[in-house]
């Protein structure tokens, strides 16, 4: 399957697609020193969230997909050097609204889980508005 969204994203910071399927995706991330939050090597949760968000976007794989909201839980700490795998599965679609479940694992241990609500607008969110009054 061809990648249709988030083509310019940094694989080093957000992960690299491992699997693209209709309604699902897997993204792998090796955590690096730039993600370190402290002297013990704790990885800032924003990088784990970014990985999960990217997997959700790829499960939908529409060019204009954006995140609307997320309900998630961090289940275990991640440290520099950990290899993470995010698995995303489309739960349902209602119009432009897509619900995606994402799990992030380090080997067999789950470190993050969440449900993402994404939207697919007809045009890119940064595209100039057309028509209307200026």
What residue ranges belong to the model's regions?
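Non-catalytic linker/capping segments at the edges of enzyme domains
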Residues: 1-35, 129-134
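Short coil/loop residues immediately preceding or within conserved phosphate-binding loops
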Residues: 12, 69, 97-99
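Alpha-helix C-terminal capping segments
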Residues: 13, 17-19, 52-61
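Hydrophobic residues positioned within well-ordered beta-strands of beta-sheet architectures
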Residues: 25-27, 70, 86, 100-102, ...
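Hydrophobic residues in beta-strands and at strand termini
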Residues: 29-31, 74, 120
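A conserved, well-ordered hydrophobic junction motif at loop->secondary-structure transitions
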Residues: 30-50
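Hydrophobic beta-strand-centered segment that forms part of the acyl-chain substrate-binding groove
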Residues: 54-90
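HotDog/MaoC-like acyl-thioester-processing domains
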Residues: 64, 79-80, 89-134
């Amino acid at each position: 399957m061809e990648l249709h969204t988030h083509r310019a994203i940094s694989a080093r910071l957000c992960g690299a697609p491992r699997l693209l399927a209709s309604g699902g995706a897997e993204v792998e991330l090796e955590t690096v020193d730039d993600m370190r939050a402290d002297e013990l090597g704790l990885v800032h949760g924003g990088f784990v969230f970014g990985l999960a968000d990217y997997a959700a976007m790829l499960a939908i794989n529409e060019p204009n997909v954006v995140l609307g909201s997320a309900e998630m839980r961090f289940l275990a700490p991640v440290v520099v050097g950990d290899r993470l795998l995010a698995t995303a599965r489309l739960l349902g679609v209602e119009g432009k609204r897509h619900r995606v479940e994402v799990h992030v694992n380090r080997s067999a241990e789950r470190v993050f889980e969440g449900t993402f609500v994404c939207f697919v607008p007809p045009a890119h969110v940064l595209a100039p508005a057309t028509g209307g009054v200026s």
